[in-house]
Amino acid sequence: MYPSVNRAHLDSVGPFAADRTVNLSKIAPKVAVATRPESHHRAGKMKALVLSGGAGTRLRPITHTSAKQLVPVANKPVLFYGLEAIAEAGITEVGIIVGDTAAEIRAAVGDGSRFGIEVTYIPQDEPLGLAHAVLIARRFLGDDDFVMYLGDNFIVGGIAGLVEEFRADRPDAQILLTRVPDPSAFGVAELDGDGRVAALEEKPKEPKSDLALVGVYLFTSVVHEAVRSIAPSWRGELEITHAIQWLIDQRRDVRSTTIRGYWKDTGNVTDMLEVNRTVLETVEPSVEGADVDDESEIIGRVRIEAGAKVSGSRIVGPAIIGARSVISGAYVGPFTSVSEDCRIEDSEIEYSIVLRGASIDGVRRVEASLIGHDVEVTPAPRSPSAHRLVLGDHSKVQISS
C-alpha cells in the first residue's frame, strides 16, 4: 500500500512547453499534416520502453544491495511513479530493460497488473548505452511508436499530454528539455532560430546551451535505422543523442518540448531528498489504522500508515510513517519519509529518507540523510570521545565534532 498523493497539486507545480509554454495535461489534439514522409503511417498503438539497468554509482553504498530505481520517495519506489505516468498516458505494453538487479525489479513490479500495464522484461548484459537498449528491444517494439522513459527520472504532471501531442503530430522524434545550471553533466540540445533541434551533444565540456535532455524520448520506428547506423562513443556506448543527431542529419522531423515545471534525475542523494520533499508536499494526511497516543503531537500534512505506533513523539509534516514502524520519544521533522518496519526512539530526524527495517536509537539529530535497509544508528559511548563506524565502499559521512 503506497501513499496517496494530491495529483491536482502536483500538476499545478508547473506547466510544460512545446517550443512555447503549454500545459501538457491540457494539450488539444492537433491535425497531422498530410504531407508527411513515408514513415508517417497512421498512428497505431504506442508502447513504452523503461530503462532500469544502470549501476547507480552515485547512490552507493545504497545501490550495492538495491536497484537505484527502487529507492523510495514518499515511501514509493521512484520507478513506480514512472510506470504510473505511462499507464495514465494510455500505454499498456511496457518493456523494462533490466541489468544486474533484474531479480529485484521483477519482484517489485511483477507482471505490471497492479499498474494496469503488461510488462515484458528485456535483459541487458552490460550498460552499453540508451541506443543499445533500443537496439536489443527491437523484437518487443516492432514497428510501433514508443516512449523511452528512464526509470530513475521524476517528472511532475506525468507525460499524458506529451504523448497526446506526439500521437497527433507524429514527428520522427520528440525530446524533452529543461534548463539546468550545469549542462555539462547532461546531454545538451542546441536549437536554431526557429526553435527546432539543430544539434545534440552528450555531456559536453563546453555546452552550447543550457538545455539538458530530460529522460523521456518519443520515437516512431525510424529510430531503429538510426541506432543501427551509429558507432559507439568514446565511452564505449551507443548514445541516444548520436541516434537523434543522425535523424537530424538525415533531415528527419525532430522536435523538442521544454519543461517549465519540475524534473529531477534521482541519481544522487541530494536530488533524491529534493524529490522526496516535493512529493511529500502532496501526500494526503491520515492516521487511520495507526496507534497514536495522547502524548504525541501530529502537526501538518502527516500520513501514518496502518499498524504504525507513535508514542510520546512530535511529528511535523509533511512527513510519512510506514506501516508497522514504531516512533517513541522522538521528533520527526518536515520532509521525512520513514518506511515500513522501522524504529525511531529518543532521536530527532528531519529532511531524510529511512528505508525498510532501519532503526535510530538515542541519536541527537539526523538531517539530510538517506538511511539504508536494516541499518542501525546508535550513539557512541561518551568516553572515550570517538566515532565508531562501519562504512561500505564509496560511503560519504559528515561527523559533528
Regions found by a protein language model. Give the residues of each.
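Conserved N-terminal catalytic core of the sugar/cofactor nucleotidyltransferase
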Residues: Y2, I27, A32-V50, R58-P61, ...
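Intrinsic-disorder-associated, low-complexity terminal segments enriched in Asp/Asn/His/Tyr and depleted
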Residues: Y2, N6-D11, D19, N23, ...
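Left-handed beta-helix
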Residues: K26, A32, R196, S221-V222, ...
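Active-site glycine-centered loops adjacent to acidic/histidine catalytic or metal-binding residues
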Residues: G54, D152, R179, N268
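A structural signal for short hydrophobic beta-strand segments in well-ordered beta-sheet cores
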Residues: L70, A189-L191, S256
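Short internal beta-strands
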Residues: G95-G99, L176-L177, I353, L370
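Short, conserved catalytic or adaptor-binding loops enriched in Gly and charged residues
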Residues: D111-G116, L191, L247-I248
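Conserved core of the sugar-phosphate nucleotidyltransferase
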Residues: I155-W234
